[in-house]
UniProtKB/Swiss-Prot annotation:
InterPro entries: aa-tRNA-synth_II (IPR006195), aa-tRNA-synth_II/BPL/LPL (IPR045864), HisRS-like_core (IPR041715), HisRS/HisZ (IPR004516), HisZ (IPR004517). It comes from Rhizobium etli (strain ATCC 51251 / DSM 11541 / JCM 21823 / NBRC 15573 / CFN 42). Belongs to the class-II aminoacyl-tRNA synthetase family. HisZ subfamily. Heteromultimer composed of HisG and HisZ subunits. PROSITE patterns: AA_TRNA_LIGASE_II. Disulfide bonds: none annotated. Its main location: cytoplasm. This is ATP phosphoribosyltransferase regulatory subunit. One of its GO terms (biological process) is L-histidine biosynthetic process. It is found in: Cytoplasm. The keyword Cytoplasm applies. GO terms for molecular function: histidine-tRNA ligase activity. Required for the first step of histidine biosynthesis. May allow the feedback regulation of ATP phosphoribosyltransferase activity by histidine. The gene is hisZ. GO terms for cellular component: cytoplasm.
Length: 373
């Protein structure tokens, strides 16, 4: 697809956005790099094209649209709820395909009816694809990071391990490596004797003072590196994590959860059965999941094409709940993907918490599917 031209179905796509009351928004191609480096996820970070301004500020070519759309919303102090639509180029280093390609999508900001907004995102993504690819049967894979977080929390793991596991959600290779480390801990070795003694004593102030003294003696600047307090707390956390072992029963509970893969119509019962058998209370996460399934049915979405996979996530760190991807049945090419990102706008500087959900289309892949028809 020549990048100097829009896809031939672009006008039809924009009409679909208009019909869904989504306002077209443009964002600069050159973006501040920091938000992407901080919260976009490791998979995207290593694909970003970096540059810098004359003053040395880190910049990048726009690698995706969600963060730029949210930044523009905050800058313009626009009220919510608000639906934005976008269509434009993004720039990523890719093993296959062009490094610059078109994406389009909708970001739905500020709707406090979470189940309804989630259902609308999935319904819009599948509905638009059905118009662009008539006669194709679509397949939707759905996951929920909030349910995974509830399972990890209910197992009573130390907070540091919870954060690590949640951060790895959706990356089974990384998740399996972390679980292996929990089953067979690798104890921290090579600690300075004085530091090991101070950590064992629990005297944080003495540990901080010792680290500060060592930094001064070796010429480390606290302005150019972590502070003594940060170093002390990271060392303590590392030691605690290295000494934490996941017992066999808890390990098998996590394995059982991650193996769940059922049609969405059966997912609520499967999750309830899992929680009862494991003796876990999943509380609000399960209630929200069930509410979303009900909202999808109420919105007329064809539930027969939706599967729930407990281990499914997307490689962007800002997702907080629903995640989903859409393919043509029998194909592995992801045509649309999205999810819920309720913490993102606050992280980017919004004064109030703004619930948000959205999705994006991969237009080059849609064009390939249309050409194959």
């Amino acid at each position: 697809m020549p990048l100097i031209n829009l896809p031939e179905f672009a006008t039809e796509l924009l009409s679909e956005f208009d019909a869904r009351n989504a306002e077209r928004i443009d964002t600069p191609v050159i973006q501040p790099a920091e938000p992407f480096l901080d919260i976009a996820g490791e998979d995207l970070r290593r694909r970003i094209f970096m540059t810098e301004s004359e003053t040395g500020a880190s910049l990048c070519l726009r690698p995706e649209f969600t963060i730029p759309v949210c930044l523009r919303h905050i800058e313009t102090a626009t009220g919510t709820p608000k639906r934005y639509a976008y269509l434009g180029e993004v720039f990523r280093q890719r093993r296959d395909g062009a490094n610059e390609f078109y994406q389009a999508g909708i970001e739905d900001l500020g709707d406090i009816n979470i189940p309804s907004a989630d259902a609308r995102a999935i319904g819009d993504a599948t509905g638009i694809l059905a118009r662009l690819l008539p006669g194709r049967r679509l397949s939707v894979t759905l996951g929920d990071q909030a349910v995974f977080e509830a399972v990890v929390q209910a197992l009573g793991l130390p907070l540091g391990w919870q954060k690590r596991l949640i951060h790895a959600f959706g990356n089974m290779t990384q998740l399996e490596a972390l679980l292996a480390g929990l089953v067979s801990p690798q104890f921290v070795t090579g600690l300075d004797d004085d530091i090991a003694r101070l950590i064992a004593s629990g005297d944080e102030q003495a540990l901080i003072a010792h680290i500060e003294q060592e930094m001064q003696a070796t010429g480390y600047s606290t302005n150019a590196s972590r502070s003594p307090l940060e170093i002390a707390r990271r060392l303590k956390e590392k030691l605690i994590l290295s000494e934490t072992r996941l017992d066999d029963a808890a390990f098998h509970v996590l394995e059982e959860f991650l193996s769940l893969h059922v049609p969405l119509v059966n997912a609520s019962a499967a999750l309830a059965g899992f929680a009862d058998a494991a003796g876990l209370k999943l509380g609000n996460a399960l209630s929200r999941f069930n509410g979303r399934v009900g909202a999808l049915a109420d919105a007329g979405v064809d539930l027969s094409c939706l599967d729930y996979r407990a281990a499914f996530g997307r490689p962007l760190d800002y997702y907080t709940g629903l995640v989903f991807e859409v393919t043509v049945e029998g194909s592995s090419a992801v045509l649309a993907g999205g999810g819920r990102f309720d913490r993102l706008l606050t992280f980017l500087g919004a004064m109030d918490r703004i619930p948000a959900v959205g999705f994006s289309f991969w237009l080059d892949r849609i064009e390939t599917e249309r050409a194959a028809a």
